Amino acid sequence: MAKRIETKDLDIYYGSFHAVESVNLIVEPRTVTAFIGPSGCGKSTVLRTLNRMHEVIPGAYCTGKVELDGVDLYGKGVDPVAVRRNVGMVFQRANPFPAMSIRDNVVAGLKLNGVRDNKLLDEACEKSLRGANLWDEVKDRLERSGASLSGGQQQRLCIARAIAVEPEVLLMDEPCSALDPISTLAIEDLVSELKERFTVVIVTHNMQQAARVSDQTAFFNLKAQGEPGRLVEIDTTERIFSNPKEKATEDYISGRFG
């Protein structure tokens, strides 16, 4: 079931470096929220705090709260692995497991979670590949390596792998940056379908993509070089692109900087 995300006074650090300051935002269930902003402004850093992926970097930590339907993901006793099971991640570059078949790539997370019944795994594989709009393209070659697919197909395979464990939220960090225009369009169409089942947050440098796929857009920026990134404003995508409140947002969207 898709869930609501809320951050409260979220500050993010890498050791003594203050990367992002005081982020307060809400992402409603079954919506797509786009994070936009210039390179280095902290949008991917914020994305990774939503499932505690930033913690894999030594010295990284955050203060404030990240809540999933009111439950603090950084609360005492909360298992980071369980968080990442509920809040899936698709990375910038497709990263299928090259030594695994297409089928085994999709069900890898389920196997890690203890599912051993082959019938259940086969059903989950088909359901997830259909959910990623990939089933018809690969159903006759499920035992081939995931690395044998094209770049766009590999990214959809990674999406299938992420949704196979039935997360409540799906995070996407520039999922189209390495893809050709046709593959990009396929991913964008898929994002629009995924929000029927999941809460989706996507980082993108492509303004047209943000306008096409998202319901809500958050603009991040730096005060100055060496200063923390910050959330400048968040609003419906229509308002952000037609009538933003902040001049910095308008300047970025119109290409005056960034």
From Swiss-Prot:
SMART domains noted in UniProt: AAA (SM00382)
Record membrane topology: Peripheral membrane protein
Key word Heme present: no
GO molecular function term, any single one: ATP binding
Transmembrane found in the keyword field: no
Catalytic activity: phosphate(out) + ATP + H2O = ADP + 2 phosphate(in) + H(+)
Gene Ontology CC entries for this record: plasma membrane
Subunit structure: The complex is composed of two ATP-binding proteins (PstB), two transmembrane proteins (PstC and PstA) and a solute-binding protein (PstS).
Record protein name field: Phosphate import ATP-binding protein PstB
Gene name of this polypeptide: pstB
